[in-house]
Each structure stands twice: as C-alpha cells, then as structure tokens.
C-alpha cells in the first residue's frame, strides 16, 4: 500500500505548515477536510503562509466598491445561467466538507459590510491571536530529527515479514482476520475519470475495489485453491498472505520499491524449498550418490540445522479458516496489482525533453514528493497528479536546507539501525491510522454509490458546509450550505446597507488573492430543511494543471470558513494552449503567490481570448467556404430544374425506356424456351448413356476381379515367403545347435586326451596310496585283535564272579526263608474263632511285597539285609541300575540283560520286558553312523533272546574287515554280526577307548579306516 507522504509528514512533524513563518511562531491551523475526486486522507488543510498572503483588508478597502459592483453585476447578469448550470451539475462527486473553528463567531446574514477600519481591526486582532496561539517553544532540530524516521519501505517490510513468520498460528490467524476486515487496498495511482470502462471494473467509489469485484476475485481464487493447489502450494500461499500483509503495512508496494515484492516472495520460496522433505531427500540422495559428501560428514553437521529444517513427515493441510483468509488476502492483492498495472499503462508518459515545465503543473509528481519528504520540511496541502491529497514541503533556501536534510537523514538512519523492528512498527502504526482515518472519512461520504447532494440529508450543518462539485481545467465549481449566521447580537451591531439582500455571505480568495472572477448565486425556491444546497458558485479564470489554494471567508467577520487545495487537471487536446508563463528558476512545491496567480490568470485569459479569436476567424472562413459550396449546389439544382421542363426530351426518354423493356421481355422468353428444352432429355442420348453405363459397369467388374486375383496372388506369395523364412530360421537355429554341440564334443575330446596323457602317473599314485592304506589297516587289525583278546579274558572273569554272586544270593535267600519260618513258629499266638488277633501277624500285611524289595537297596553300596558287598571294579553292570527299581536310570544299556549272560542261572526277579518296541529294535542302521559295528544298541543286542550263547570268531572278523577296507562309504556286511559291547560308547566316532579287567586299547575300526583313507 503506497504511503501518503503528506499524512506521513504531518504525523511525524508539527512544524510550521503555513508558509515561511518566523522561528518560534506557530500559525493557528484551520480545521479542514477538503477532498477531491473521491480521495481524501482526513488531514487538515492549513491556510496559505504569510509569503503567499496579501493584506486583505487593504485590498478589500481599496477595491471594495469596484469589486462589489463587479460581483453584483456578474451575479445579476449571469445568475440564472450559472445557477441552472450548477443545478445541472448537482450530482457531481461530493468531495467532503470543511468546518470552521469552534470559536468562530458568525455575523448576521444580511448585515452590512464593515468599514475599512473595522476590517483592519478584525484582521489585526485575528493575526495577534494566531501569533499568541502559535508562540510556543520552538523544537530543537536534533530532537525533531530523532523522532522522525525516514521512509524505508524495504526495511519495514522485511522486518514485519520476519516478525509475522515467528508468530504462532493462532496469532497469525487473528492478524490475517484483522487485515482482511480492514481491506487496505489503495487506488491504482490514476484518477478514475482518465480511465476507460475496463478499469472501472476494479474501481469502487472510494478508491477501493467494488464489492462485486471482491466477491468475484475471492470466488475465482477459492476455486483455483481447491482444484489446482496441493498441500505444499497451500502452505506456500499462506506465507504469501503474510508477505502481502507485510508489504501493505510496511509500505513496500510503492512505485519505486517494486523490488520488495520479489525479495519477500523469494525469501518465503527459499524457506519452503529448504523445509520441503521431498526436496531434502532429493538433494541429499544425489549428493550422497555422487559422493560429494559422506554420510559421516552429514550426520556430524546435521545437528547444527534448526529442527524446523529436519522434517521427518510431510506437511499437513492448513485449516479452512486460514485458507479462506489467505484466499481473500491474495485475491485482493492480485486485484490491486491489476489496478496498478492498468493505471500505470494508461497514465500519461512523463516528458523526456530538457524543456522546463510549469512547476505548478509538476508539483504533484512523485519525484518531487519524495524529495520533499526526504528534505523533512513542513508542507501545505494540495492535490497531486494521482488524485490524492498531497502536502508538499516548504523549502529552505540554499545551503541550510541541504545541511539540515543531511543531518536529519543521518540521524533517522541511526535510529532505524539501532531499532529496526520498532521503527517498522512505528511506520506501520502511522500507515494503519492514516488508512483508518481515510476509510472512516470516506464512509461518511461514499458508501458504495456515487454521493449526491440528496445523500447529505440529516447531516449536521451547524458550522456550515462547503464542497467541490466539479473541477475543470480552467474552473472549479462548488456548493455551500446555509452559511448565514443567526447571532442576533452580532447582527444588531451590523449597520444596514453593508450586506444587502443580493450580497453573498462569503467570498473566495485563490492563493491569497481576492479572486474577482467568482460567480456565486443563491439557489431559488428552496424550502427550509428540504435541501442542504443554498449557494452554488464557480471559480473561473484558472490555468490548467496548476495547484490552487482556495480560501472561503465570511463577508461579515472576515473569518475563514475553510481552505481547500485543488489541482486543476490537464486540458484536453482540443483546448490545449501553449503556456507562456515564465518558469521560476527554483521549483516551487506550494501554490503560487497572489501576484503570480493573478498574472498567470490574466495571461491565461488573454491566451484564451486570442484562441477564441483565432477560432472565430477560422470558423468565419469555414462558414464562408460552406456557404459558397451550398450556393454552388443550389445553382446546379436550379439549372437542372429549369432544363428538365422540355416535353420532347421527356417523350424520347420514355420511348427509349419502352423499347428497352420490350427487348428485355423478348430475351426473357428465349431463355425460358431454352430452359424447357434442357429439361426434356432425348431418347437417343438416354439409350447411348445406358449402353455406356453398362459397358462401364462390366469393365468395373473385370477390374474388381483382377484386383481380387492380384490380392490372392500377393497373399499366397506372402505365405510362401513367410514359410521359407521360417524354414530358414529353423535351419539357422539347428546349425547353431550343431555348432554348439560340436564345440562341446571337441572340448570333451581334448579333456579325454589330456586325461589319457596323465593316466599312468595317476595309477601309480593310487597304487601307492592303496598300499599305505592296507598297512594302516593291518596295524589297526592287530590292535583290535589284542583288544578283543583282553576283552574276552575280562568277560570270562566276569562270568566266574557272576556265578559266585548268584550262588551267594541263593544261599542268602534260603537262609532268610528259614529265619522267617522260625520266627513265625516262635511268635505264633493262641488261635481264636475270629482268627488272629490284631497286631499279631506282621508279614501278612504285605503279601504281595516281593522279596527283592526287602533285600535290595541302592546299587551304589549293594547292601543286602545289612550285609554290604564291595562294588565290582570292572563289572559290565557297574553302571546299570537294579532291574527291580521302577525309577532307575539306564545311561548305558536297556533293562534287558546282555545276551552273553543268558546261559547263566537267571534270577526270578530279572524277567523284565524291553521298554523298546519291535519297530525300534529291528530298525536298520543309518549309513551315517560309521561306528555301528561297536554299538551297544545293535539289533542283535535287543534280540538277544533269539541268539545262541556268545561266540566270537576273530578270524572271520578279520576277513570281513579286510574285504570292507579301502572305502569309507561302503555299506556294512550283512553276514557279520554286530559286536555287542557291554561298555559305554565314546562321544565321537572318530576316536574311541575301552578298558577291561586285564587290558586296555584305543581306536575303532571306523577311525582307523578314516585315517587310512
């Protein structure tokens, strides 16, 4: 939103705004709200300074009679015309109202004009009061510069954007809502009257977009938001809304700061690209794949990045409230950009020549405004080229102004560098308050439609009302309410004759000069209270494209009603006049002095008079030419009229016309006959046509049959070609297969030849290995023979000792039985009819108890009825549990006794069934168990009940071992009985050990075989 330099300067500075007043003096400001073309900023418009003022009482007194007579004559002569003209223009734009001071005293409406002395006294009193009111303590320039900040839209915008991006989402939503409710959309920069109807679409009555345009743009952006924007784009658009808020509040949208938009959008875009998870994965993946950076380096420095940049999950969609606010803000931003672009394209191009231009015409240019703003001088109100109320500065002269401007600029930069954010907030506050006052002022005068004078009904007009109705290149039209004072005391003091019935209650001064060419007329036939328009007037004799300060003063009290600053527009091409006004050497940023204004008005009037004379001469010449041309045409018509009265010529002409008619009729009849003949076809031609048609059809059939034959032949040829191609392909494939087979056969042949060449050496090596293996096997067999001999001797010893033990057991059992019988006989009680007495029969309580349970204890100490026997040192049953115990463990053998003990006398307590089933007992030995020949769990061991007594044939075993030697993977011989060793097996088949009663040995057949191989 472009800042209004006038309001900004007024808000920061309270220096003298009424001209080059003396230091320490302050002239009282008049309250004013003058507006033009629907644009206002709510700032007061001060009166002209002393340098642009004249001695009104003296000038009034010197020319009072002449002016009064002139005004009265002009009013009487042109009263009806001007009033009707003003009434016709009554529906012009209402440009505001300006009220006088509250302490202003009004004279009587029809009072007399005071004398010169009275006017001088009133003027002097007013001057003294204004001096007293303005004699405040002067402000130190250093203090003033320290409180004024130079306009820096870029810094302000970036500071506000950074602040907005740090706010939480809830506060951001509130800020966007407040911004959207205010809808700060400034005008595009050009007046609406200079644009075509295309721009009027974006132009509302108060300089803002119309309601229909806002709704349409919001709907279009909302549709685009929902259809085409994904989640990342929606979040980016939310931050773009923050950018728009920052640009608007920071003033970054002004014409010479267009780069702020690009910078802010670029900052937000870079932040979103860095925070995007997809882009991070893409960039890091390519950097790692290209080995530009290593994963270790990345993990080492990744913790330095903020947590916001390390996203682990994609962004979520914004809420619908923030989406609607962002859509509205972006839509209004797009509308403002379109309006500015259209206004810039339609605005007149600035002159590029080195000629001097009128300073008053260029007083409202943006460059001069910026220069005036940077100089920091005080200003007075006038209308700029863009239609806004601008207040240019009152310049200092020479070196003092340049030095003070540099100091002020340097101190302002120091303040901004120390506290940039607070400077931005201060600038934002000024901008917001100015726009708020602007909108509030416009809401009183422009509420959606063009304001008319009828809309002022009900407005309080106690202090009077003056407003501009039309501004032309050479005139300003205005209207006023009832400005007649009702103060009876003042009216009683007024002498009769000073203000008559036809005199106006106010007069107009332009640029401090009493303007004589002002036409003021009173509206006739206006009922009291029915209309607010009581006076209409026109200020004429003005120059185009110049700034004027129009002061409205009361005729009775000489007090100002209001002061309006107006800039006349550029004259049209048809009314363009080359100005011959001399341009001052120094450009002026305020309205001209009264003398200069009068001179310019006189020169302009003379130029207009000369132009009108020139146009009159040209019109006279044109009229003469037109009159002569009309006279020539009249003479021609008269001559033709007089020459057309001859009857003979008329008769000849009629005969000629009749002859032409007859010839035309005859030609028409001939053409009709020819048409009838063309409709009837001759029979000969019809027969010939039929014959030619039949011939054509026959030829066509032949042609079609020939085409079919050609197509058939082509298809047959194509099939043959395809078949041949397939045969060729199969032949090529077969040839390739044969070539591959030939290659493989050749390779096999070469390998066979090489193997045959190396065959003798291989046989010798194998024979040597076989001989060494046989020697090893012979050694192993000898070792086994020794072990077998020692084992057989141990077995015989065990058998002898076992027989002795069984004999001892039988003897003990017999002794025990005899002892029990004797005890029964000794302890027998007298018999009773009921039987034995309770407690007399001790052994009958356990009739089913086996004798082994009474005589057998744990196998570890082998005790029997208190008699302990030492355990056998090398008994094969040393680790076997008692066959009677139900919970005995069997770590080395099943409960069934080995087969070599069956020929010994068996105990009646040893008949126990095998816990293994028949399938397990008779299962085949696995080939992976290489030590199956010495296994304790062989099938012959479990089937020992069907075997004869233990017999061991060592010679047969040796023969079988020799047959099975030489190969580790040979199957076991079916004719050889497995060795039922009573000793526990070793844990590995590669090595084994055994011990007997009288010998020991190491090794196993399988281990020996493995070593031999």
Swiss-Prot record:
- The highest taxon in the source lineage is Eukaryota
Q: Where are the transmembrane segments?
A: 158-178, 211-231, 254-274
Q: What start-end ranges are recorded for coiled-coil regions in this protein?
A: 596-782
Which residues fall in a compositionally biased region of kind Basic and acidic residues?
Answer: 954-965
Record keywords: Coiled coil, Membrane, Transmembrane, Transmembrane helix, Ubl conjugation pathway
Please tell me one Gene Ontology term that the record gives under cellular component.
membrane
Ranges of compositional bias, category Polar residues:
30-65, 875-899
Q: Topology in the membrane?
A: Multi-pass membrane protein
Q: Where is the composition biased (Low complexity)?
A: 1003-1013
Main localisation: membrane
Provide the protein's localization.
Membrane
Instruction: Provide ranges: composition bias, Gly residues.
Output: 993-1002
Q: Where is this region: Disordered?
A: 1-65, 105-137, 339-367, 875-902, 953-1013
Give the family from UniProt: Belongs to the acrB family.
Q: What does this protein do?
A: Component of the regulatory network controlling carbon source utilization through ubiquitination and deubiquitination involving creA, creB, creC, creD and acrB. Involved in resistance to acriflavine, and required for normal growth on a range of sole carbon sources, including fructose, cellobiose, raffinose, and starch, and reduced utilization of amino acids, including GABA and beta-alanine, as sole carbon and nitrogen sources.
Name of protein: Probable ubiquitination network signaling protein acrB
């Amino acid at each position: 939103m472009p800042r209004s330099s006038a309001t900004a300067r007024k808000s920061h500075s309270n220096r003298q705004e009424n001209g080059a007043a003396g230091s320490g003096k302050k002239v009282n400001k008049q309250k004013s709200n003058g507006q033009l073309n629907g644009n206002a900023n709510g700032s007061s418009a001060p009166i002209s300074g002393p340098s642009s003022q004249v001695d009104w009482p003296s000038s009034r007194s010197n020319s009072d009679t002449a002016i009064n007579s002139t005004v009265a004559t002009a009013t009487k002569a042109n009263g009806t015309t001007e009033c009707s003209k003003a009434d016709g223009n009554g529906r012009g734009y209402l440009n505001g109202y300006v009220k006088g001071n509250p302490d202003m005293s009004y004279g009587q409406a029809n009072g007399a004009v005071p004398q010169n002395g009275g006017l001088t006294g009133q003027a002097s009193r007013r001057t003294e009061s204004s001096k007293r009111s303005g004699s405040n303590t002067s402000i130190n320039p250093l203090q003033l510069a320290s409180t004024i900040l130079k306009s820096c839209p870029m810094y302000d915008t970036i500071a506000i954007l950074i602040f907005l991006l740090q706010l939480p989402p809830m506060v951001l939503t509130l800020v966007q809502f407040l911004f959207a409710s205010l809808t700060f959309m400034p005008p595009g920069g050009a007046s609406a009257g200079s644009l075509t109807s295309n721009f009027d679409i974006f132009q509302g009555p108060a300089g803002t977009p119309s309601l229909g345009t806002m709704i349409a743009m919001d709907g279009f952006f909302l549709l685009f938001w929902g259809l085409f924007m994904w989640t990342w784009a929606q979040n980016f658009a939310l931050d773009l809304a923050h950018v728009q808020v920052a640009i608007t509040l920071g003033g970054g949208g002004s014409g010479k700061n267009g780069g702020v938009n690009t910078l802010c959008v670029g900052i937000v875009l870079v932040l979103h690209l860095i925070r995007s998870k997809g882009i991070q994965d893409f960039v890091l993946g390519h950097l790692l794949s290209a080995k530009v950076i290593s994963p270790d380096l990345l993990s080492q420095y990744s913790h330095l990045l903020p947590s916001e940049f390390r996203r682990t999950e994609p962004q979520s969609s914004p809420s619908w409230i923030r989406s609607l606010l962002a859509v509205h803000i972006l839509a209004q931003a797009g509308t403002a950009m379109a309006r500015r672009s259209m206004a810039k394209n339609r605005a007149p191009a600035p002159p590029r020549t080195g000629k001097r231009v009128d300073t008053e015409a260029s007083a409202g240019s943006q460059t001069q405004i910026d220069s005036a703003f940077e100089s920091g001088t005080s200003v007075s109100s006038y209308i700029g080229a863009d239609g806004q109320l601008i207040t240019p500065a009152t310049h200092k002269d020479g070196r003092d102004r340049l030095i003070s401007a540099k100091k002020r600029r340097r101190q302002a930069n120091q303040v901004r560098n120390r506290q940039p954010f607070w400077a931005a907030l201060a600038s934002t506050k000024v901008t917001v308050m100015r726009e708020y006052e602007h909108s509030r002022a416009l809401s009183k005068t422009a509420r959606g439609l063009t304001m008319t004078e009828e809309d002022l009904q009900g407005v309080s007009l106690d202090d009077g009302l003056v407003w501009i109705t039309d501004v032309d290149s050479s005139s300003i039209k205005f209207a006023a309410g009832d400005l007649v004072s009702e103060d009876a005391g003042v009216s009683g003091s007024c002498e009769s004759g000073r203000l008559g019935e036809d005199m106006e209650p106010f007069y107009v001064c332009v640029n401090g000069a009493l303007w004589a060419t002002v036409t003021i007329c009173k509206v006739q036939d206006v009922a009291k209270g029915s209309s607010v328009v009581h006076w209409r007037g026109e200020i004429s004799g003005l120059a185009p494209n110049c700034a004027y300060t129009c002061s409205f003063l009361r005729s009775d009290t000489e007090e100002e009603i209001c002061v309006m600053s107006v800039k006349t527009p550029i004259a049209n091409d048809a009314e363009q006049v080359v100005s011959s006004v001399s341009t001052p050497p120094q450009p002026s940023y305020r309205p001209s002095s009264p003398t200069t204004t009068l001179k310019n008005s006189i020169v302009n009037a003379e130029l207009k008079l000369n132009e009108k004379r020139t146009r009159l001469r040209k019109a006279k010449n044109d009229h003469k030419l037109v009159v002569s041309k009309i006279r020539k045409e009249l003479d021609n018509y008269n001559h033709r009229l007089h020459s057309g009265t001859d009857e003979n010529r008329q008769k000849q002409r009629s005969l000629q016309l009749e002859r032409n008619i007859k010839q035309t009729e005859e030609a028409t009849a001939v053409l009709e006959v020819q048409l009838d003949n063309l409709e009837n076809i001759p029979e000969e031609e019809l027969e010939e046509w039929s014959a030619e048609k039949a011939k054509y059809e026959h030829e066509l059939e032949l042609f079609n049959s020939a085409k079919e034959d050609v197509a058939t032949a082509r298809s047959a040829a194509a099939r043959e070609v395809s078949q041949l191609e397939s045969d060729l392909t199969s032949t090529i494939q077969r040839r390739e297969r044969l070539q591959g087979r030939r290659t493989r056969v050749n390779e096999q042949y070469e390998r066979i030849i090489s193997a045959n060449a190396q065959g003798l050496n291989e046989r010798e090596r194998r024979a040597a290995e076989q001989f060494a293996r046989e020697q090893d096997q012979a050694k192993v067999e000898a070792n086994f023979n020794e072990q077998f001999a020692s084992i057989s001797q141990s077995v015989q010893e065990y058998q002898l000792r076992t027989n002795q033990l069984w004999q001892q057991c039988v003897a003990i059992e017999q002794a025990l039985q005899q002892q029990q019988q004797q005890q029964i006989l000794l302890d027998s009680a007298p018999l009773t009819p009921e039987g034995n007495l309770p407690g007399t029969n001790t052994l009958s309580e356990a009739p089913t108890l086996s004798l082994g349970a009474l005589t057998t204890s744990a196998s570890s100490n082998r005790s029997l009825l208190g008699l302990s026997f030492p355990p056998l040192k090398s008994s094969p049953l040393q680790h076997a549990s008692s066959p009677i115990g139900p919970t005995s463990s069997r770590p080395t053998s099943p409960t069934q006794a080995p087969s070599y003990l069956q020929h010994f006398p068996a105990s009646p307590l040893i008949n126990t069934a095998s816990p293994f089933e028949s399938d397990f007992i008779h299962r085949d030995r696995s080939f992976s168990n290489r030590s199956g020949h010495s296994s304790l769990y062989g099938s012959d061991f479990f089937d020992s009940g069907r075997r004869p007594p233990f017999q061991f044939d060592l010679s047969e075993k040796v023969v079988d071992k020799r047959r099975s030697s030489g190969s580790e993977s040979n199957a076991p011989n079916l004719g050889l009985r497995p060795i039922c060793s009573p000793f526990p097996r070793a844990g590995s088949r590669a090595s084994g050990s055994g011990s007997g009663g009288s010998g020991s040995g190491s090794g196993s057949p399988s281990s020996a075989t493995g070593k031999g191989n």
